[in-house]
């Protein structure tokens, strides 16, 4: 290998075209060339779109500044955005109010809605001379209102500037000013939150087609509940009042609660579901108060359906055991029958009851006027059992050609709940065999396990003698 200093002699000679003159220098790009390179390959509207994006970012920054999105570390908006005068004015307009009850309305001519007036509280009058009202009637403009502040006193007061005389009625709850006790706000009736939570907000996903073996019962149920709500003119033409109460009774698992869920899905009326044991309270009078507030809330609705499940918890026949243990339950039942058909009209309220023991209910609760129709949910027949199998197997992966009538013949005197358990067990047999489809053999095994094997746990025959 030649020495390093002799490498030059071994290089190939350059041609004249490849030789670079020594005086060539690198020329820097001008501003125009840079702009050309930046815009090279850009679309015709790229500059306008870029300008629009910058304008949008500028507007967004100004909106965030005005709205106070970017706040300081202390959690407050910048000081230049403070509106101290507006805050003071807002605090001056809104004051905390006291809750009172309007017990009497005294007209401007000295008369009241009642035959007597309370003269003892006239010395506590604190009238408002600058009262403004939208009502043109002079009596309403000069009317005074007797309010009762709990554990304080009674006062005769006037209305605030933002309250109309037509908004105030005797017996309603009102919000009064703490200093002058003027009525500033009408309040809705007080209802226990536990009663309000009984309202069904979301409609169930059960329809009448999901209820098998209850064709006649569904027709009777719809005549009582749906027909008066959808076609009230039919009853008005005949001059009769539509039935307002219905009792669903039968052995457990025959579809009573399922039909009630289908009614809640079908109608647009407010649906209230009450479990009988919820009305049994510890303290005296609590259960009757809940029943009273329940019907008060139902009367505020345009149309309402109340469903009492397991009504035998509070609707049992009255008796004296000597110890008085069931006195509170009997008081609750008396309040219930009073609300159903007492001195005050029930209104457009339909009531449904469900029980497994109709023989234990009080005769006063079962009389016509309170419960107009009694529907028995008996055991399904052969056609009904086959229909129930088809309904429950609709969402299952089963093979074609299963003889549902044959399987139904193997399940005599079975309820809908037991037939659903048969479908579930058939799916379990398919899972044990690592199959994705349930076969007819799986259903036959399930019938042998559920209907024959669990027969000693069935209470259907015992409940049949009660219905």
Curated annotation (Swiss-Prot):
<feature type="compositionally biased region" description="Low complexity">
    <location>
        <begin position="117"/>
        <end position="134"/>
    </location>
</feature>
<dbReference type="GO" id="GO:0031625">
    <property type="term" value="F:ubiquitin protein ligase binding"/>
</dbReference>
<comment type="function">
    <text>The 26S proteasome is involved in the ATP-dependent degradation of ubiquitinated proteins. The regulatory (or ATPase) complex confers ATP dependency and substrate specificity to the 26S complex.</text>
</comment>
<feature type="region of interest" description="Disordered">
    <location>
        <begin position="1"/>
        <end position="26"/>
    </location>
</feature>
<feature type="modified residue" description="Phosphoserine">
    <location>
        <position position="231"/>
    </location>
</feature>
<dbReference type="GO" id="GO:0036402">
    <property type="term" value="F:proteasome-activating activity"/>
</dbReference>
<dbReference type="GO" id="GO:0016887">
    <property type="term" value="F:ATP hydrolysis activity"/>
</dbReference>
<dbReference type="InterPro" id="IPR050221">
    <property type="entry name" value="26S_Proteasome_ATPase"/>
</dbReference>
<keyword id="KW-0647">Proteasome</keyword>
<dbReference type="InterPro" id="IPR048723">
    <property type="entry name" value="PRS7-like_OB"/>
</dbReference>
<feature type="modified residue" description="Phosphoserine">
    <location>
        <position position="164"/>
    </location>
</feature>
<dbReference type="GO" id="GO:0005524">
    <property type="term" value="F:ATP binding"/>
</dbReference>
<dbReference type="GO" id="GO:0006511">
    <property type="term" value="P:ubiquitin-dependent protein catabolic process"/>
</dbReference>
<keyword id="KW-0067">ATP-binding</keyword>
<comment type="subunit">
    <text>Interacts with UBR1 and CIC1.</text>
</comment>
<dbReference type="GO" id="GO:0070682">
    <property type="term" value="P:proteasome regulatory particle assembly"/>
</dbReference>
<dbReference type="InterPro" id="IPR003960">
    <property type="entry name" value="ATPase_AAA_CS"/>
</dbReference>
<dbReference type="InterPro" id="IPR003959">
    <property type="entry name" value="ATPase_AAA_core"/>
</dbReference>
<protein>
    <recommendedName>
        <fullName>26S proteasome regulatory subunit 7 homolog</fullName>
    </recommendedName>
</protein>
<keyword id="KW-0539">Nucleus</keyword>
<dbReference type="Pfam" id="PF17862">
    <property type="entry name" value="AAA_lid_3"/>
</dbReference>
<comment type="similarity">
    <text>Belongs to the AAA ATPase family.</text>
</comment>
<dbReference type="InterPro" id="IPR027417">
    <property type="entry name" value="P-loop_NTPase"/>
</dbReference>
<dbReference type="InterPro" id="IPR003593">
    <property type="entry name" value="AAA+_ATPase"/>
</dbReference>
<dbReference type="InterPro" id="IPR041569">
    <property type="entry name" value="AAA_lid_3"/>
</dbReference>
<dbReference type="GO" id="GO:0000502">
    <property type="term" value="C:proteasome complex"/>
</dbReference>
<dbReference type="Pfam" id="PF21236">
    <property type="entry name" value="PRS7_OB"/>
</dbReference>
<keyword id="KW-0963">Cytoplasm</keyword>
<feature type="region of interest" description="Disordered">
    <location>
        <begin position="108"/>
        <end position="140"/>
    </location>
</feature>
<dbReference type="GO" id="GO:0045899">
    <property type="term" value="P:positive regulation of RNA polymerase II transcription preinitiation complex assembly"/>
</dbReference>
<dbReference type="GO" id="GO:0043161">
    <property type="term" value="P:proteasome-mediated ubiquitin-dependent protein catabolic process"/>
</dbReference>
<dbReference type="GO" id="GO:0008540">
    <property type="term" value="C:proteasome regulatory particle, base subcomplex"/>
</dbReference>
<dbReference type="GO" id="GO:0005634">
    <property type="term" value="C:nucleus"/>
</dbReference>
<dbReference type="Pfam" id="PF00004">
    <property type="entry name" value="AAA"/>
</dbReference>
<feature type="binding site">
    <location>
        <begin position="250"/>
        <end position="257"/>
    </location>
    <ligand>
        <name>ATP</name>
    </ligand>
</feature>
<dbReference type="GO" id="GO:0005737">
    <property type="term" value="C:cytoplasm"/>
</dbReference>
<keyword id="KW-0547">Nucleotide-binding</keyword>
<keyword id="KW-0597">Phosphoprotein</keyword>
<dbReference type="InterPro" id="IPR012340">
    <property type="entry name" value="NA-bd_OB-fold"/>
</dbReference>
<dbReference type="GO" id="GO:0045732">
    <property type="term" value="P:positive regulation of protein catabolic process"/>
</dbReference>
């Amino acid at each position: 290998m030649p020495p390093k200093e002799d490498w030059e002699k071994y290089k190939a000679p350059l041609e004249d075209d490849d030789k670079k003159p020594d005086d060539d220098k690198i020329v820097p790009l001008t501003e125009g060339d840079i702009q050309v390179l930046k815009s090279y390959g850009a679309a015709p509207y790229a500059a306008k779109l870029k300008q629009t994006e910058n304008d949008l970012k500028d507007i967004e920054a100004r909106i965030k500044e005005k709205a106070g999105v970017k706040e300081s570390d202390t959690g407050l908006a910048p000081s230049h955005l403070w509106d101290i005068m507006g805050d003071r004015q807002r605090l001056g307009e809104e004051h905390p109010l006291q809750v009172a009850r309007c017990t009497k309305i005294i007209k401007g001519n000295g008369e009241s809605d009642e035959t007597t007036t309370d003269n003892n509280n006239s010395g506590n009058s604190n009238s408002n001379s600058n009262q403004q009202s939208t009502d043109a009637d002079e009596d309403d403009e000069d009317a005074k209102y007797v309010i009762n502040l709990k554990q304080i006193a009674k006062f005769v007061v006037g209305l605030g500037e933002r309250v109309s005389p037509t908004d105030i009625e005797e017996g309603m709850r009102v919000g009064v000013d703490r200093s002058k006790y003027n009525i500033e706000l009408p309040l809705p009736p007080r209802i226990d939150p536990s009663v309000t939570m009984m309202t069904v907000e979301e409609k169930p996903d059960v329809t009448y087609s999901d209820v098998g073996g209850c064709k006649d019962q569904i027709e009777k149920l719809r005549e009582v509940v749906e027909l008066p709500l959808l076609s009230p003119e039919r009853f008005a033409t005949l001059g009769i009042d539509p039935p307002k109460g219905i009792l669903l009774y039968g052995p457990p698992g025959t579809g009573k609660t399922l039909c009630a869920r289908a009614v809640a899905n079908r109608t647009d009326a407010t649906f209230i579901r009450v479990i009988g044991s919820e009305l049994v309270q510890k303290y005296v009078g609590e259960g009757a108060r809940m029943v009273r507030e329940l019907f008060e809330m139902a009367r505020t609705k345009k149309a309402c359906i109340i469903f009492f499940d397991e009504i035998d918890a509070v609707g049992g026949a009255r008796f004296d055991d000597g110890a008085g243990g069931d006195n509170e339950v009997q008081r609750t039942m008396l309040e219930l029958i009073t609300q159903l058909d007492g001195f005050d009209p029930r209104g457009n309220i339909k009531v449904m009851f469900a029980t497994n023991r109709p023989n234990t209910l009080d005769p006063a609760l079962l009389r016509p006027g309170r419960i107009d129709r009694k529907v028995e949910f008996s055991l399904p027949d052969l056609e009904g059992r086959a229909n129930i199998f088809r309904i429950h197997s609709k969402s299952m992966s089963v093979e074609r050609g299963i003889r549902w009538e044959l399987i139904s013949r193997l399940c005599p005197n079975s309820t809908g709940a037991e037939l659903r358990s048969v479908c579930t067990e058939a799916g379990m047999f398919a899972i044990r065999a690592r199959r994705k489809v349930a076969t007819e053999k799986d259903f036959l095994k399930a019938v042998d396990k559920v209907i024959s094997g669990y027969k000693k746990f069935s209470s259907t025959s015992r409940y049949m003698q009660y219905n």
